Amino acid sequence: MGLFQKCSRLSLRSSYMWSVCPQYSIAVTARETPDRALIVHWTQHRDVHNSRRLGANPANPSAAPPRLPFSRVTQEDLSFFRALLPGRTITDPDLLKSSNVDWLKTVQGSSDVLLRPKTTEGVSQILRYCNERNLAVCPQGGNTGLVGGSVPVFDEIILSTSLMNQVFAFDNISGILTCQAGCVLENLSHYLEERDFIMPLDLGAKGSCHIGGNVSTNAGGLRLLRYGSLRGTVLGLEVVLADGHVLNCLATLRKDNTGYDLKQLFIGSEGTLGVITAVSILCPRKPKAVNVAFLGCSSFQQLLETFQCCRGMLGEILSAFEFLDASCMNLLEKHLKLTNPITECPFYIVIETAGSNATHDEEKLHQFLEEVMTSSLVTDGTVATEATKIKALWSLRERVTEALTHEGYTYKYDISLPVEKIYDLVQDMRRHLGGMAKNVVGYGHVGDGNLHLNITSPSKDFDLLAAIEPYVYEWTSQWKGSISAEHGLGLKKRNYIYYSKPSEAVALMGSIKAMLDPKGILNPYKTLPDNIN
Amino acid sequence: MGLFQKCSRLSLRSSYMWSVCPQYSIAVTARETPDRALIVHWTQHRDVHNSRRLGANPANPSAAPPRLPFSRVTQEDLSFFRALLPGRTITDPDLLKSSNVDWLKTVQGSSDVLLRPKTTEGVSQILRYCNERNLAVCPQGGNTGLVGGSVPVFDEIILSTSLMNQVFAFDNISGILTCQAGCVLENLSHYLEERDFIMPLDLGAKGSCHIGGNVSTNAGGLRLLRYGSLRGTVLGLEVVLADGHVLNCLATLRKDNTGYDLKQLFIGSEGTLGVITAVSILCPRKPKAVNVAFLGCSSFQQLLETFQCCRGMLGEILSAFEFLDASCMNLLEKHLKLTNPITECPFYIVIETAGSNATHDEEKLHQFLEEVMTSSLVTDGTVATEATKIKALWSLRERVTEALTHEGYTYKYDISLPVEKIYDLVQDMRRHLGGMAKNVVGYGHVGDGNLHLNITSPSKDFDLLAAIEPYVYEWTSQWKGSISAEHGLGLKKRNYIYYSKPSEAVALMGSIKAMLDPKGILNPYKTLPDNIN
């Protein structure tokens, strides 16, 4: 009992507030052992002060809380699922393996059943049944999340959208696409490009991630600077609520002010309030001309000045302004054998333009490049207009995450800060950690003020971890930043929410959860902190 | 009792669902007469079938419901307010007049007190007191709404944001503005233009409307096509909840995925869930070049083809594509003495470009104009690049609403439809009404699929109204449109919500209202329908 001094669960009696029930879940867990929850990432348990701010396990706020008293899946349940989804109720442990572990292989669940419905009605029947039986459910898209949000923590039933991959409609006048939640982002991109449109979002995981998962996690990615967030581009959603009711908000209108915009509740709530089954989204025209420039800067200050100059001179054709530091480049060369196309620099920039007139775009880009080269803001650079070369330059930015996985163990932080502060955190962290870390690297979306801070060590190192956290969160909070800019909170970051949100806001989130999912069956242990007071 | 056969109110006992309490409120109302509610717009009461779909008063779903049993303002209450807001507690009936009636002079309340706090703390103390005393409150910004959402229906206390007009901060690197809710949109525009930025929204009412009201109503306006909706550009809000608690979500980050995005609840909920006291908003750079073209088309089909061509050729510099029909032009000439700058046509288009390179923009615009003139899509046109001429061309679109007010009585509809359908509704309505209406005119935002359908008669005409409604809503619903694209529902449209939203969605809205404002004191009788089942 020493380890988890407090735990919280959704109260069944109150629909308004989560209530903290000390010891109750622990007692249940103890009775129902063995629980097979295993957080590979976190295993050290130290005796430190119980901090209310950091939730159930103050020594290790990312660790899984005790299993909540959900029912266990019985043979009778399996019979129900098999009758409902013949051939699509998976219980073979080998087939379940990849769905029980996240992409980073840091969170390991132990679910015994994976359901693969094809229709909204199927999802509805599953949730109605699970809600009645008090069975917990983990909705899963492409399972590419980085915060342990898309895998079970214990034995939650995995509800996969992988067979829900139909495009319902595309209107080539308005550019509005309507499709099922399980469509893979890259497949949608190909579908649209054939029709002279593009998706308003793009990210490294596009080959696997599902649009439903993108919406559930409010994915940002590489095009946010230009096309804005999913909160603006998603026009409609169909969602199945915890009790199986289908909420049809699948509008295909650019403007609709009839009542509260319910779909916003489900964007970014990581499957904890409902399961998204279909999406309608506003897609931009495919640009007639795309150019990518890869530039080098000798300081972050020069990089920022280049960004300012770029926004002024490229204006409406600027579609991405990304950066990586020299340490990232070293890892790309070392592990992925990618070649640095320019001379070595402390900082590299990827600039993309997308416009409707190739001549105009090239002229703007060349004027900009001339300006930043003659003023010595940029020390070297290369430009690509041809698709293969564009892809090669982009891969230098997109494959940093992959390169890092070869380094041993990676501690990942996804931070929003005022743009002029983003690299200060990397430099300060290097000073702070001294020789403890193998690498402290920074890359990300300058245009959005979004830093991906990654710290590597040969293997898991809890002394290193203790030096990073909560230091990184305190640093972020001090500058009124966000401790999760685009990755979400999932399992790993849930208890750090108070560094970015006041307690009144978190309490209200708990009320919303309790209203929509009173039994708490949807993606438990995710997003919201263990203790909401 | 015949008139209002059912009425609903927020249940005090349940936080989960609105409950329908037949007759209860009626009884209270009868005891507490005189109630001075007067809906100027609607006075006819006919004996028709009670339609559940259309709420409390099926003959006249826009009419005010009976007064709910809120407390009446006492001398003791006034003493409290005067101590809290010395000199800013207005009870002089002459001074209250303009705050009791909407801009269109169609909804008339009878509030006896107008409060003008300067700070969030002031708003908090007012709401805490009103919630405890069960006093209803009508939040009011610039009072420019068109659906009766910003004026009291009975004796609700008017809580004005007019003295909350401070700019807190502007970051000229990120373009993020943070200000109080009562800042007038045009003042913010001037403030930003001096700093080489612009507001991401612009609308005809800019000289009076408040940014807090814009956000509360999710105002669309003229720049939505380019800069997207407030759901994407508003980065943070500070909101005072019904019980006086301050919810600080005033982030200034472009990306933040830490938990549910609570601010979205308050965008577009018309002050029924909380009072917005401060806003942070992402502002675009001021474009270096602006051009406006005013064109004529001989059919709506040609107008649509011009739109398609325009999107392709102007691409990223297109910032507005608006239209008005010949009837609108006649009214502009007749009542406002504006001059049509081109030859007479059935349809007129206002196209605005905004870009970073004047030469490129002019070249794109000229190429586009050459294309649409030589292909005869457009019959005549004029272009302005100079500010005064740009303003003059824009006024032809912006002042249509004003011209209509001179026509006698106007029935206003703000409809979203698939863009190729928007003028069909105008033509069909003309056929349907025959000689009953004086004018049936259409104008609006083609780029957003948003039609402003306006029907005039010399004076209020209930036979005409009965011919328009619910016909117009049924027509819209048949094409899966929105019965309120950007104006909101307010008092006038609240009971028509079911034409655009399924009952499950409306019930969930009721649950959210009950959770955040269990006594229902915030802007009662607005947004949600009288009967939620």
UniProtKB/Swiss-Prot annotation, chains A, B:
FAD-binding PCMH-type domain location: 107-286
GO biological process: malate metabolic process
UniProt: (R)-malate binding residues: 397, 401, 412, 487
Top-level EC class: oxidoreductase
Residues in coiled coil: none
Any one annotated GO CC term: mitochondrion
Subcellular location field: Mitochondrion
Family under the similarity heading: Belongs to the FAD-binding oxidoreductase/transferase type 4 family.
Name of the featured protein: D-2-hydroxyglutarate dehydrogenase, mitochondrial
Organism: Danio rerio (Zebrafish)
Gene name in the database record: d2hgdh
